[in-house]
């Protein structure tokens, strides 16, 4: 039984066969002063329907669960009158328990009109030894839709509005025993529940709830609930409720199309009192045949907590995902920025999007969709008190573009990550591949647009490959784009910021069939006079890691290609200030393999810190750039080639880069081990001011080494070639404009080449192999990372 004045459900037998035998079937004649414009028949349990005064009906409830079928009163044309007109009141009352439940089935009129409630609904417990208090769970079902008018008020223990039917037994099981409530709509129904502006819904007992379930849900009124809300758009829906937490699954999506969920009112309630008093707002929709969207505006969330350490409540918005308590797609809102939503549990492939704008959220918020999740400050500005988690498989974005502000007091996660499936019972191998989307934070377009984040930030478009674990087949991983950009706007972050677009091979060992992995784009940039102020550390990562191929059984390569990690001020200028260290990485590590040919390639990308126009990058700590390429180990042949990428900081047409501590740039190439060592080729690493000023407070180090791999497997193999690349610490200038590079400590640039170790002798017929050749960077040779530049060392 759902206890509205307790935080834990009681599992006691309620309305059994003996109680059913006492059920009353009362169908009073329509009276002129009757409040409800319908004739009611009690079809389950025991209750009595009376008109106690003019326009006031009272339903006295004698059993824990009651079901009443209502036949609407019609006009001469077959149209239903308002079920509860303005000024009329329906009172549901029990003198035996505050935990009674009443399901009101409003049957269709001749013309199938929407059922309209404009009056007042009250449910209460009349304690003979105490005052009357709100209590009871009241449900209204109408298959043709429900309209809650602007004059309607509800003062209840708990409330459900639905266009989906249920059985008497299922309703009793939910109400009395905390079981599953199975709700089923007519196939293809698009019936809507609309709650108009001005409508007031109040449920004050602790552990209350308010549920709205239909093909189309439009919540435009106000609901203040001392517990949890659930707004669900679907055709078949399962609900269970315990300790303030809903489990919500939608086996069949809504037949409605377009915007099927709108919360554009005041949705909230008092704060949780602490452990066991869970306050949640849920909104779910599942698509069926046609694309759908969900819109959230105005006010969401609960009152501030009265004591430190208490979470006042949480908000979960979900498109094409079921929800279990606080968990969606394998991740929990309570885990904040560390949550991982990688269970591949989307319930539909049909597009379902979420849009949040012009809103105030007074609790932590998670919005997750199978496709696009977008949050914008809108023309009115927006705010979140708590953490903000935005997850969209194709796109997740957070922005302010209308000259208004967007503030978040806690941490922010913006994720378009993708996870390949790992399974031994696959129907389609495509699902083991991962292709991430686009994740972004953006402020700009209109001057005055701003974003202020009080905690840490993670913007992620990583791709995590899956695998067929029966046949040991690896999936591919293609990272997306992750960015934090201020363009004519202002972004302030009080904590650390991580921008990640990595390509990660499967972690399943002993892979036999490898696949390619690629890093994407990680961008932290200002342009058009935009500004970014980051108090903590910055981490940009577009690394790529190949899968772990078997070294004992035959296995194919998993080539890895690093992406682009960019810290930059772009056209139109701007400024970036980082209070801690800055780290950018676009390294690549080829996967292991066992084949007679070459091993996996490790081809690094670009890790750069540039100003392309007049502007400023100021880093209080150190700056580290890494674009190392490591070839994969190959037990059956030649080790993989390792290709260093570009790790550089540059000024092109002016501007200033200040680094308070040390500067380190690495673009090394490391050949993989094999029966013959793989070759390693250095890339391009360093710092250069063509025009402008670079100041490094500590030491500066640039390395573009080429290191050959060793002949580790078998006997007598030769080591791999090691060829150095291009390393530089330079200031050029022109006849008209100056350039300076100032280093406060040691300055080192290295483009060494070191051959790999030869294989060992078997002590008998096979002699030890020779070491690989090593060549330092040579100016006569174009660099493999960018043939427009020759190799060598330049200071």
Where on the chain are the PLM-derived regions?
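Extracellular and secretory-pathway beta-repeat/beta-biased strand scaffolds
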Residues: 2-795
């Amino acid at each position: 039984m759902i206890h509205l004045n307790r935080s834990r459900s009681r599992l006691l037998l309620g309305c059994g066969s003996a109680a059913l035998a006492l059920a009353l079937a009362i169908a009073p004649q329509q009276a002129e002063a009757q409040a409800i414009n319908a004739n009611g028949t009690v079809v389950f349990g025991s209750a009595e329907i009376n008109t106690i005064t003019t326009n006031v009906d009272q339903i006295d409830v004698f059993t824990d669960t009651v079901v009443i079928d209502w036949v609407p009163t019609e006009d001469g044309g077959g149209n239903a009158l308002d079920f509860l007109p303005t000024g009329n009141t329906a009172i549901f009352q029990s003198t035996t328990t505050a935990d009674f439940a009443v399901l009101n089935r409003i049957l269709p009129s001749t013309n199938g009109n929407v059922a309209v409630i404009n009056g007042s609904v009250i449910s209460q417990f009349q304690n003979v030894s105490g005052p009357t208090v709100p209590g009871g769970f009241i449900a209204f079902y109408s298959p043709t839709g429900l309209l809650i008018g602007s004059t309607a008020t509800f003062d209840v223990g708990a409330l459900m509005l639905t266009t989906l039917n249920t059985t008497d037994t299922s309703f009793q099981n939910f109400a009395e025993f905390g079981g599953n409530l199975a709700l089923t709509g007519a196939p293809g129904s698009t019936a809507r529940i609309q709650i108009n502006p001005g409508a007031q819904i109040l449920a004050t007992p602790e552990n209350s709830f308010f549920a709205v379930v239909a093909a189309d849900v439009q919540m435009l009124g106000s609901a203040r609930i001392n517990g949890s809300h659930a707004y669900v758009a679907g055709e078949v829906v399962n609900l269970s409720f315990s300790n303030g937490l809903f489990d919500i699954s939608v086996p069949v999506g809504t037949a409605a199309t377009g915007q099927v969920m709108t919360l554009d009112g005041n949705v909230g309630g008092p704060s949780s009192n602490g452990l066991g008093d869970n306050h949640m707002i849920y909104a779910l929709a599942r698509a069926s045949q046609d694309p759908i969207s969900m819109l959230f505006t105005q006010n969401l969330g609960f009152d501030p907590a009265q004591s430190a350490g208490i979470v006042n409540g949480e908000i979960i918005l979900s498109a094409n995902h079921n929800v279990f308590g606080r968990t969606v797609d394998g991740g929990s809102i309570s885990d904040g920025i560390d949550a991982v939503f990688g269970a591949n549990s989307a319930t539909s492939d049909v597009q379902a999007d979420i849009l949040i704008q012009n809103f105030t959220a007074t609790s932590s918020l998670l919005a997750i969709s199978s496709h696009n999740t977008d949050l914008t400050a809108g023309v009115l500005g927006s705010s979140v008190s708590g953490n903000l988690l935005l997850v969209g498989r194709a796109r997740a974005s957070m922005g302010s573009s209308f000259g208004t502000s967007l503030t978040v007091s806690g941490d922010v996660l913006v994720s378009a990550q993708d996870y390949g499936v790992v399974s031994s019972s696959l129907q389609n191998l495509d699902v083991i591949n991962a292709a991430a989307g686009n994740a972004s934070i953006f402020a700009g377009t209109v001057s005055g647009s701003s974003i202020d984040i009080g905690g840490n930030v993670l913007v992620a478009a990583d791709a995590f490959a899956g695998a067929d674990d029966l046949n040991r087949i690896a999936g591919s991983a293609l990272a997306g784009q992750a960015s934090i950009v201020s363009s004519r706007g202002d972004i302030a972050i009080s904590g650390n910021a991580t921008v990640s677009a990595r390509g990660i091979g499967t972690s399943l060992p002993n892979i036999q069939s490898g696949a390619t992995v690629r890093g994407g784009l990680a961008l932290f940039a200002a342009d058009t006079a935009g500004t970014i102020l980051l108090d903590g550390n910055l981490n940009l990562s577009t690394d790529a890691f190949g899968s772990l191929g078997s070294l004992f059984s035959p296995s194919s390569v998993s080539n890895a290609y690093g992406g682009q990690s960019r810290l930059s001020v772009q056209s139109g200028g701007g400024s970036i200030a980082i209070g801690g260290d800055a780290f950018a990485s676009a390294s690549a590590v080829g996967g292991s393999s066992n084949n007679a040919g070459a091993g996996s390639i490790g081809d690094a990308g670009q890790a750069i810190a540039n100003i392309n126009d007049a502007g400023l990058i100021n880093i209080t700590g150190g700056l580290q750039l890494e674009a190392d390429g490591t070839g994969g180990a190959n037990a059956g042949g030649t080790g993989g080639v390792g290709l260093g990428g570009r790790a550089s900081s540059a000024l092109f047409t002016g501007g200033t880069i200040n680094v308070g501590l040390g500067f380190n740039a690495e673009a090394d190439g490391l050949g993989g081990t094999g029966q013959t060592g793989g070759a390693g080729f250095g890339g391009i690493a360093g710092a250069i001011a063509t025009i402008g000023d670079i100041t490094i407070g500590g030491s500066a180090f640039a390395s573009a080494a080429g290191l050959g791999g060793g002949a580790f497997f078998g006997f007598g193999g030769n080591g791999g070639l090691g060829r150095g690349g291009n390393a530089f610490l330079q200031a050029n200038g022109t006849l008209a404009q100056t350039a300076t590079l100032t280093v406060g400590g040691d300055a080192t640039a290295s483009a060494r080449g070191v051959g790999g170790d030869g294989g060992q002798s078997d002590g008998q017929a096979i002699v030890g192999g020779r070491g690989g050749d090593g060549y330092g960077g040579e100016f006569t040779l174009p660099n493999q990372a960018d043939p427009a530049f020759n190799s060598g060392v330049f200071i």
